[in-house]
A protein has these predicted regions:
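Glycine-rich helix-loop-beta junction characteristic of Rossmann-like nucleotide cofactor-binding loops
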Residues: 15-21, 79-80
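Class I SAM-dependent methyltransferase SAM/SAH-binding core
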Residues: 27-78
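A short glycine-rich, Lys/Arg-flanked "PGG" loop and its adjoining helix->strand segment in the class I
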Residues: 102-117
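C-terminal alpha-helical "lid/dimerization" subdomain adjacent to the S-adenosyl-L-methionine
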Residues: 119-174, 178, 183
Length: 190
């Protein structure tokens, strides 16, 4: 399903920016059907796939099995995980679904261990209001400088927010639109 929105190069960009190692515990926020989870599970010791939708999690379980992936139902703005409990946080197309993206980033920073890494991709700002109804989008993307500010506000270091070469494509009434995406990465101080 997700391949119709964006390509494998988005997954590769997020996973490369996250610098996952074989000893890492990775949290995939807004894991959905496992777009990033699958790639992270090939590298990491353990992956926690968090999504608010039981249906998405069930689809991911059917596709990936359980193996070294732990599936959890939950809200990214209020995660039921201990402080400093994961080495890496990854996410794709999650921030624009939450009312308080700054709170979501604060939670991601909270659960990261000192020295841990975060890498998330999402939509840049756009004006396609119909996505609010068709895809349950709360935000119509973000300005990259706003994402940079949210990450710095949460005391993350080495923050980078760059435009991805890939776009998110969606169709309404036979009109295909391409929305630019960004990749944000950072590190929690030691």
């Amino acid at each position: 399903m997700r391949k119709s929105f964006y390509g494998e190069e988005v997954r590769d960009a997020v996973l490369n920016a996250a610098q996952i190692s074989p000893d890492d515990t990775v949290l995939d926020v807004g894991a959905g059907t496992g777009f990033l989870t699958q790639g992270a599970a090939m590298i990491a010791r353990k992956v926690i796939a968090l999504d608010f939708s039981r249906g998405m999690s069930d689809e991911s379980i059917a596709k990936l099995g359980r193996g070294k992936v732990e599936f959890r139902i939950g809200n990214v703005e209020h995660m039921q995980l201990p402080d400093s409990s994961v080495n890496v946080v990854i996410g794709n197309m999650v921030l624009h679904h939450y009312p308080h993206p700054d709170m979501a980033i604060a939670e991601m920073a909270r659960v990261l261990k000192p020295g841990g890494r975060i890498a998330i991709s999402d939509l840049q700002g756009h004006n396609y209001e119909w996505l609010r109804k068709e895809h349950a989008d709360v935000w119509l993307g973000f300005k990259m400088e706003d994402v940079l500010a949210m990450m710095k506000k949460n005391r993350l270091e080495d923050v980078k927010v760059d435009e991805l070469s890939s776009c998110c494509t969606s169709t309404q009434e036979e009109q295909q639109v391409k929305i630019p995406m960004f990749l944000a990465s950072a590190r929690k101080p030691v």
